[in-house]
Curated annotation (Swiss-Prot):
Keywords, sorted A to Z: NAD, Oxidoreductase
Self-association and partners: Homotetramer.
Enzyme class: oxidoreductase
Gene encoding the protein: iolA
Name of this chain's protein: Malonate-semialdehyde dehydrogenase
Signal peptide start-end: none
Reaction equations catalysed: 3-oxopropanoate + NAD(+) + CoA + H2O = hydrogencarbonate + acetyl-CoA + NADH + H(+); 2-methyl-3-oxopropanoate + NAD(+) + CoA + H2O = propanoyl-CoA + hydrogencarbonate + NADH + H(+)
A molecular-function term among this protein's GO annotations: malonate-semialdehyde dehydrogenase (acetylating) activity
One GO term (biological process): thymine catabolic process
Its EC number(s): 1.2.1.27
This protein's record includes keyword tRNA processing: no
Length: 486
């Protein structure tokens, strides 16, 4: 339930809500108003150790629960998430700031991830080949790996945790979850509903906090694997530190997603697609379009329509259904984004839509409106860096080949999109672009949960992505059995 009461957030360890053993807390404001809605503990190492101990003890019995029985628990959890989806969306808007429309979409994508987890028995099946030699059979079996941990960001406080712990738990593991200290309330509700579904205590544990919790997870000898989503520098740190301590790690990192606009595109749908990708969720998502490479032949027409439509977007509290762009997560992030806008102007880019000029009626929240730059080049910071905001850079290119070359010069390679009605253009793009997830006339090429989610280059550290068969392989260990009976 959403109330006006300022909440003191707790950890959930071994089936119980408990106060952190530490004394340090951090205020959690509503990004749309700046008013404090909660205090979250910055838990110390001792809290992580207790959570791991609980998960380790629970693993001894949970890993032996028949696979169909584990799925039945997840079906109950899925039902509870569906029954409470309106409340969950409102919590997201309250603490994250994204519009209620965007939050509702996130809830649905999270539910779809749990739907995938319920099918884990099928995805976990091994392989067998009889009579590989005289009287000898061979087979591959998949087993859970033990205690695993997830470290998740503020921008998708429901979807990303649900990529992780339901599938890991369906595979027979137990879990320690550390969500962003900026969005702790949704995590609490996810855990409450999880235990309402009848899971045994200790199967899922929640430890709130900051970098001390992260370091404790990475260094704890009883945690076998770590899933992470966040910025590129932190992802690199998590991967290097976790693997140094002998852990299996998947670390999904930053992005600078490009869209190539061809002269043969459907102009109206392309403009609306770019707007949705660049400015929905205030641009705070790793699959947002942040650069458009538009072919010269259509550039002026495309830009004119894009600017006109963007100027219609309203900025404000996400609970107001008229608003399209909500606040950024924190005042510090807003100041960082304003710095990038100033940098773009100083570097000589043309500011076509200035998100700094927004209606004063938006109040005291952390607002930056949709922003568009033209005349951007690869030497500018606004092209190079992940800004994580509703800031779009336009680069004019002569043809598809130049657009592909531009895109591939980025150090990131998460997602990329082409807008075209030409199958040959789409095929050339697909085969030559360096990105983990590719869209053809698809605004945000984030795959459904039954496909793997992972980028390339500085957008991903590890071997196996989240979701789909990648996720099952990450959360399980293979045993190859060769057997003969006399």
């Amino acid at each position: 339930m959403i109330t006006t009461e300022i909440k003191r957030v707790k950890n959930h360890i071994n089936g119980e809500w408990v106060e952190s053993t530490g004394t340090e807390v951090e205020a959690v404001p509503n990004p749309a108003t700046g008013k404090i809605i909660a205090y979250v503990p910055l838990s110390p190492k001792e809290d992580v150790e207790k959570a791991v101990e609980a998960a380790k003890a629970a693993f001894e019995t949970w890993s032996k629960v028949p696979v169909p029985n584990r799925s039945r628990n997840l079906y109950k959890y899925l039902q509870l998430l569906q029954e409470n989806k309106d409340e969950l969306a409102k919590i997201i808007t309250l603490e994250n700031g994204k519009t209620l429309t965007d939050a509702t979409g996130e809830v649905q994508r999270g539910i779809e991830a749990v739907e995938l987890a319920t099918s884990a028995p099928n995805l976990m099946m091994g392989q067998a080949l009889p009579n590989i030699a005289s009287g000898i059979d061979g087979s591959i079996w998949r087993y859970p790996i033990g205690v695993v941990a997830g470290i998740t960001p503020f921008n998708f406080p429901m979807m990303i945790p649900l990529w992780m712990f339901p599938l890991a738990i369906a595979c027979g593991n137990t879990f320690v979850l550390k969500t962003s200290e900026r969005t702790p309330l949704l995590a609490e509700r996810l855990v409450e509903l999880f235990y309402e579904a009848g899971f045994p205590k200790g199967v899922l544990n929640l430890v709130q906090g900051g970098k001390d919790v992260v370091n404790s997870i990475l260094e704890n000898k009883d945690i076998q694997a770590v899933s992470f989503v966040g910025s590129e520098p932190v992802a690199r740190y998590v991967y290097e530190t976790g693997t140094k301590h002998g852990k299996r790690v998947q670390a999904l990192a930053g992005a600078k997603n490009h869209a190539i606009v061809m002269p043969d595109c459907n102009l109206e749908k392309t403009v609306q697609g770019v707007i949705g990708s660049a400015f929905a969720s205030s641009g705070e998502r790793c699959m947002a379009c942040s650069v458009v490479a538009v072919v010269d032949e259509i550039a002026d027409e495309f830009i004119d329509v894009l600017v006109a439509e963007t100027k219609k977007l309203k900025v404000g509290d996400g609970f107001n259904e008229d608003n399209y762009v909500g606040p950024l997560i924190r005042e510090s992030h807003k100041e960082r984004v304003l710095g990038y806008i100033s940098s773009g102007v100083a570097d000589g880019a043309t500011l076509l839509v200035d998100g700094r000029k927004i209606n004063e009626e938006v109040g005291e929240g952390y607002f930056v409106g949709a922003t568009i730059f033209d005349g951007v080049n690869q030497e500018m910071k606004i092209w190079q860096d992940e800004i994580f905001a509703p800031v779009l850079s336009i680069v004019r290119v002569k043809d598809l080949e130049e657009g592909i070359k531009l895109t591939n010069q980025s150090k990131f390679a998460n997602g990329a999109v082409i807008y075209t009605s030409n199958g040959k253009h789409a095929q050339t793009f697909r085969d030559n672009i360096d990105a983990g997830m590719i869209g053809v006339n698809v605004n945000v090429p984030a795959p459904m949960a039954f496909f793997a989610f992972a980028g390339n280059k500085a957008s991903f550290f590890g071997d196996l992505g989240t979701n789909g068969t990648d996720g099952v392989q990450f959360y399980t260990r293979k045993k190859v059995v060769t057997e003969r009976w006399f």
